[in-house]
Amino acid sequence: MKSMIEGVKKDGKKGRRNDRKDSWDKDGFTQRGRAEKKPVDLAKIQGIQGQIGIGKNKGDGNRLDCGMDKEEAEDGKDIMRCRHLSPGGGGMKRLLSEDVRETEGIGWESLGLGPVLLKRIRDIGYDFPSPVQVASIPHVLGGKNLLVRSKNGTGKTASYIVPMLNMINSSELSIQGIILVPIRELALQISRNVKRMSEGTGVISAPVVGGTSMQDDIIRVSNGVHVMVGTPGRIVDLVEKRVGTLSKRVILVFDEADKLLDVTFGETVTKLLDLLPREKQMLLYSATFPYFVTGFIRRYMKNPLCINLMKELAPVGVKQFYTYVKPSEKLLCLKSLLLRLSINQCVIFCNSIKTVELLAMKITEMGLPSYFIHSKMAQEDRNIVFHNFLKGKCKILVATDLITRGVDAPNTNYVINFDISKSPESYLHRIGRAGRFGAPGVAISLVTTEEKEMLMDIEAKLGKEISPLSDKGLSRLHESNIDRNQG
């Protein structure tokens, strides 16, 4: 990373700028930065469930029998079909890949949902449920504990929000549902989805996250809510203080379960489980489930049903490329990509906060306004940046892995790894930002010769070779104009 800045100099002097008085260290980085229900039609969904691997956890103590093995990914040719989908009710045309279209003939009416919620789904404009929704919703309604493995951007969120809303008794003003997520932005996003989906149902929800006023959260929850959406720490604080009334039976969702159960949050999560009523339904959702999750499942989940939809790890609609580049030429290579690609919106990932801040400045200097976001920013600033990016006020967002988990920016058609991911799991979640709900996208990684082994590790995990990006290939990408708003 040392000479990353060498490609862009001001007045012929490395690290000097005309418009600011920031000092630069020897590596060219700034020394400071800113920071009535219908019966479930099981016959209709039997076929899809037979394909995707639904079964109980064997619990042999050595591995989790929930699709840890994977098949070799297909090359992705001819997978795209034009489909009229209007998730916002706006009639937007999108290209959808087969991994979200294979349930197209199954209606929401077959899943056992009540009339109020079915009407709301129609009003929003969801044409048909995705495979993960078809596979899991009837089992959630049946009170099962679930472990669901599904690719990023395939509708996992609705697969638990919809049945949860259907099961909640709105006349009982108690906390009946808790949705745990690892990052604040995802909590706010899911909370908006719950509020939108629950319109007309009488269900009250509230986001509760760290970095915001605890007093405000206490007031909101004390006034009565049915669903809390938030990060583990803040939810534990509220439950410990006995804020709000807990129902005798709680539906507890782990979104991005692998992250919630790692060393970062594991202790807090287990504390929450001890505080909650013994009677609870637990739903775990993620694209990746490391082996350490097995111990948690054996201890806390009674007879969980495993649903695995991972025929391949990567989103089918995302084309993946890499290009070898010298560290000193990374910035120039990135500039060439940004100028030549037909970008709706793009997320550029870096491995450090310092690189994120500096790179955003450099991209803006190129005449391409960009935002940056990372965990050390004030929550208010993070909210503004993310909101503005979602609203399309800026095309380019430079970020750490903060936003790799479930965050949905539907107009993002390109992901660029300025720094290659430190782990295959991180890579998988990164590229998922460009393939939301089966839409097409492209992921490009800039790889130095020292990082070849990391690239090989990622390919081994995916079970697929990532294609090198040639100049001709780049031209083809430009000509193909991968646009999420066009069929």
UniProtKB/Swiss-Prot annotation:
Q: GO molecular function terms here?
A: ATP binding; ATP hydrolysis activity; RNA binding; RNA helicase activity
List the catalytic activities from the record.
ATP + H2O = ADP + phosphate + H(+)
Which stretches are transmembrane?
none
Motif Q motif: where?
Answer: 106-134
Q: Which Gene3D superfamilies match?
A: P-loop containing nucleotide triphosphate hydrolases
Recorded hits in InterPro entries, A to Z, give:
DEAD/DEAH_box_helicase_dom (IPR011545), Helicase_ATP-bd (IPR014001), Helicase_C-like (IPR001650), P-loop_NTPase (IPR027417), RNA-helicase_DEAD-box_CS (IPR000629), RNA_helicase_DEAD_Q_motif (IPR014014)
User: What domain notes does the record hold?
Assistant: The Q motif is unique to and characteristic of the DEAD box family of RNA helicases and controls ATP binding and hydrolysis.
**Where does this chain mainly localize?**
cytoplasm
Q: Quote the function comment for this protein.
A: ATP-dependent RNA helicase involved in mRNA turnover, and more specifically in mRNA decapping. Is involved in G1/S DNA-damage checkpoint recovery, probably through the regulation of the translational status of a subset of mRNAs. May also have a role in translation and mRNA nuclear export.
Return the GO cellular component terms, semicolon-separated.
Answer: P-body
Domain (Helicase C-terminal): give its ranges. Answer: 317-478
Native source species: Encephalitozoon cuniculi (strain GB-M1) (Microsporidian parasite)
Cellular location(s): Cytoplasm, P-body
Has UniProt tagged this entry with the keyword Hydrolase? Answer: yes
Domain of life from the UniProt record: Eukaryota
What PANTHER family does the entry give?
DEAD-BOX ATP-DEPENDENT RNA HELICASE 50 (PTHR47960)
- What's the protein here called? ATP-dependent RNA helicase DHH1
